[in-house]
Regions:
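Bacterial N-terminal signal peptides
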Residues: 4-13
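Residue-level recognition of beta-strand->loop/alpha-helix junctions
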Residues: 27-29, 60, 128, 223
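CN hydrolase (nitrilase-like) catalytic-core segments centered on the catalytic cysteine
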Residues: 79-99, 168-261
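Conserved beta-strand and immediately adjacent loop positions that scaffold enzyme active sites
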Residues: 22, 113, 148, 241-242
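Short beta-strand segments enriched in small/hydrophobic residues
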Residues: 19-30
Length: 274
């Protein structure tokens, strides 16, 4: 798989000194197909994030329609489009940067996407998942393009997005490493059968820690709460236990096991030197 670097510069280069950012890890409940309820739960989390003086609110994968939900083929909207417009309005209302997984319709294709929206409501970046686990839904998500992996310069530094199973792929992880982000925000839909929890959370913890150490930057891996309702993994549980790891690969926060939580953490940005 041939990968190329994509970097978009929106603001001037930031000074090299240490800087911090407050990230609200928004481990919300997402119910498949419940667009209005899921938007309501997103807004509840944003209320908590603003009250905690967060700068960024980080949400899970497919937070609006649910992951691997075949109904998304008819329900999803383009980006930009109705769902991303609503998220932009929420970013403006709460004065927060938002990263969130949003299923995206583009013609007859459905993408498992994530967007980064600044506090003015501008979409700074969109990532389409590459490692889509095609056997879980028919028709499956379309794959993103490797050449579109990138980072974006923001008021907080260079921020990148990948999605869940993208972090399994060493070639994707290597390209992220080459992009030298200051912060990676990774929406997850980390599912397993009920008997595998809470042990399954340890696998998420190890994976996020591995990539943070490789990328030499903090990584926020935000998982969702809920249950899969379609496909071969029907009935599997999203168990939360979202993970925050510092630039050395040290796990510094793990959110609640199988329960909703919004936790705001202060992260020191900048590349680790090792």
């Amino acid at each position: 798989m041939r990968l190329a670097v994509t970097i978009i510069v929106l603001l001037g280069a930031l000074p090299a000194q240490s800087r911090t950012v407050r990230v609200a890890v928004c481990q919300i409940l997402s119910i498949d197909g419940d667009r209005e309820g899921n938007f309501r739960r997103v807004e509840y989390a944003l209320e908590d994030a603003r009250a905690a003086h967060a700068d960024i609110a980080a949400f899970p994968e497919s937070a609006i329609l649910g992951w691997e939900n075949p109904d998304s083929h008819r329900m999803a909207t383009p980006i930009p489009g109705a769902d991303s417009d609503r998220l932009a309005a929420l970013a403006r209302k709460y004065g927060l940067m938002i990263s969130i997984g949003v299923d995206e319709k583009d013609g007859d294709k459905l993408y498992d996407s994530a967007i980064l929206v600044d506090k003015t409501g501008k979409i700074l970046w969109k990532h389409r998942k590459l490692n889509v686990l095609a056997w879980l839904m028919a028709p499956p998500y379309s794959e993103g393009r490797p050449e579109d992996i990138g980072v974006v310069e923001t008021a907080f530094g260079r921020i990148g997005l990948v999605i869940c199973a993208d972090t399994f792929v060493d070639q994707v992880a290597k390209r992220v490493e080459q992009l030298a982000p200051d912060l990676m925000l990774v929406p997850y839909g980390w599912a397993a059968t009920v008997d595998k929890w809470p042990e399954h959370a340890k696998e998420l913890e190890k994976l996020v820690a591995k990539r943070a150490a490789q990328w030499k930057c903090p990584v926020v891996g935000t998982d969702v709460i809920g249950v899969m309702t379609h496909g071969p993994w029907k009935g599997q549980t999203y168990g939360g236990a979202s993970v925050v790891v510092d630039s050395s690969g040290r796990v510094i926060h793990i959110l609640r096991d199988r329960d909703v939580e919004v936790r705001t953490v202060t992260l020191e940005l900048g590349r680790a030197v090792r």
